[in-house]
Amino acid sequence: MTNEDFIEALSSAGITLTTQQVRQFERYYELLVATNEHVNLTAITEKKDVYLKHFYDSLTVAMYEQKLKSSESTLIDIGTGAGFPSLPLKIAFPDLKITMVDALKKRVNFLQEVVDTLDLTGVEIVHGRAEDIGQNPKYRENFDYATARAVARTSVLAEYTLPFVKIGGRFLVMKGSAAHQELLDGQKALAMLGGQVNEEFVFTLPNGDQRYIQIVDKKTKTPKKYPRQAGTPSKKPIS
């Protein structure tokens, strides 16, 4: 996917980028590739692949959750890594307020460099594990949206994310081909953590790769014991 393809595909989906935003994506790509030479950020480094599989893919969630485009919503991105999906969303929709969480200091330093270089505001970067931060009153049940892009199966992701979502907010699940079965397997965990599946969307990227976006509504407060201590959700998922 070239720059032009990226701009055109987004335009077809109702997302129009300004010249400044196009430049910000270009600079983001340059920083990603340069830093990736000494910090493990991504296995995807070809420009056309980064634009498709990181930038475009990150923005697909706003095609199905329209409020991300136009409101000053708050979004927390768990295990953000190199900033996906939250930084592409922030670049495309500047009013969105984002919080990025990652456990690796080197990645946090990279994210700060991107935020500073692109002169982004309304961004907080938190170094730590979701299980610890999810028990912090500053962050707990304080966000309109939480997302995590393919960092674990849905039953585990739910424990990482739903404690951050306020009642009436949403957990946005972004997944590849195994998503539907994961959602079925994760129903008990979602319910126990206060979530309820609202909708599931299946679509393909411009290259034909299948993707799922699942929208989980936060209906009730998450019990205080969740998230459990660091490492437990992945070792002993709620089932």
Curated annotation (Swiss-Prot):
Which InterPro entries does the UniProt entry name for this protein?
Answer: rRNA_ssu_MeTfrase_G, SAM-dependent_MTases_sf
State where the protein is found.
Cytoplasm
- Which keywords appear in this protein's UniProt record, sorted alphabetically? Cytoplasm, Methyltransferase, rRNA processing, S-adenosyl-L-methionine, Transferase
Specify where the region named Disordered lies, as residue ranges: 218-239
Q: In its keyword annotation, does this UniProt entry include S-adenosyl-L-methionine?
A: yes
Which Enzyme Commission numbers does its entry carry? 2.1.1.-
Can you tell which superkingdom this protein's organism belongs to? Bacteria
**In the record, what terms sit under GO molecular function?**
rRNA (guanine-N7-)-methyltransferase activity
Listed CDD domains: AdoMet_MTases
The UniProt annotation places S-adenosyl-L-methionine binding at: G79, F84, A130, E131, R149
What does the record list as coiled-coil region(s)? Answer: none
Which PANTHER family does the entry link to?
A: S-ADENOSYL-L-METHIONINE-DEPENDENT METHYLTRANSFERASES SUPERFAMILY PROTEIN
The record ties this protein, via HAMAP family, to: 16SrRNA_methyltr_G (MF_00074)
UniProt similarity note: Belongs to the methyltransferase superfamily. RNA methyltransferase RsmG family.
Role of this protein: Specifically methylates the N7 position of a guanine in 16S rRNA.
UniProt-recorded name of the protein: Ribosomal RNA small subunit methyltransferase G
Record the organism: Leuconostoc mesenteroides subsp. mesenteroides (strain ATCC 8293 / DSM 20343 / BCRC 11652 / CCM 1803 / JCM 6124 / NCDO 523 / NBRC 100496 / NCIMB 8023 / NCTC 12954 / NRRL B-1118 / 37Y)
